[in-house]
């Protein structure tokens, strides 16, 4: 299944990752939790970024967050980014960038 996901994302890369299509694909994706366990490494006090695939077009990873963990405010510098919650809950807060100047 992981190879199928990577191949589908490579197809989307050829189309510059059309947002509605990629979003729909990820929402409808029936992931096998046993396959994800191979990529799911947890830490008690901070989140982990577990890389599955990386090439010049995209990165695919499993991010494991313990409860009540936060990440610093950050940007993706114009990149398209999707997150899918496989288990549990995730709260995301998007901010509007008012200035690119340092504080």
Regions found by a protein language model. Give the residues of each.
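Context-gated lysine
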Residues: 8-10, 37, 54, 80
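A short glycine-rich, His/Asp/Glu-containing loop-to-beta-strand
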Residues: 38-67
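Phosphate-binding glycine-rich loops and adjacent basic patches that engage nucleotide phosphates
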Residues: 23, 44-49, 79, 84
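A short beta-loop-beta micro-motif enriched in histidine and acidic residues
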Residues: 54-58, 69-82
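Short, intrinsically disordered, charge-balanced linker/junction segments flanking boundaries
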Residues: 100-103
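Glycine- and acidic-residue-biased ligand/ion/polar-headgroup-sensing regions
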Residues: 67, 78-96
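N-terminal leader/capping segments at the start of a protein or of a new domain
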Residues: 1-34
């Amino acid at each position: 299944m992981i190879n199928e996901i990577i191949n589908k994302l490579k197809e989307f890369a050829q189309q510059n990752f059309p947002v509605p299509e990629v979003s729909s694909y990820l929402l409808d994706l029936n992931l096998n939790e046993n396959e994800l366990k191979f990529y799911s490494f947890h830490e008690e006090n901070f989140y982990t970024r577990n890389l599955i695939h990386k090439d010049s077009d995209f990165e695919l990873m499993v991010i494991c967050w313990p409860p009540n963990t936060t990440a610093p405010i950050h940007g993706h510098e114009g990149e398209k980014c999707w997150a899918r919650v496989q288990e549990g809950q995730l709260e995301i807060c998007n901010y509007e960038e008012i200035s690119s100047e340092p504080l």
